[in-house]
Design a protein with these regions (language model features):
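HIT superfamily nucleotide-processing domains
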Residues: 1-105
Length: 105
């Protein structure tokens, strides 16, 4: 059993407000909500950070970002812009060591 909170969310061991899911990623609302709609996009394959991605995983994960961003925007007509952010490594302030991309309206 893993102690990774994102693995537990992916495996439906703990609840989350899911925005999007397919065979490659799970996107869900960040529990801290920097702004309304703050969403995390998490690869289902456990990789600690961007340095562990291979080309196929990177292509598959990042190809889904626009679709998920449009869904976040469609959920709230007040959203006029969106930041895409990923902290990679402890020195970059990564706090959960399962790669994830923040979509912050």
């Amino acid at each position: 059993m893993t102690d990774c909170i994102f693995d537990k969310i992916i495996n439906k061991e703990i609840p989350a407000h899911i925005v999007y899911e397919d065979d490659v990623v799970l996107a869900f609302l960040d529990i801290s909500q920097v702004t309304p709609g703050h969403t995390l996009v998490v690869p289902k394959k456990h990789v600690a950070n961007i340095f562990e991605y291979d080309a196929d995983l990177a292509s598959a994960v990042f190809a889904r970002i626009p679709k998920i961003a449009r869904a976040v925007q469609a959920s709230n007509p007040d959203i006029k812009g969106l930041n895409i952010l990923s902290n990679n490594g402890e020195l970059a302030y990564q706090s959960v060591f399962h790669s994830h991309i923040h979509l912050i309206p």
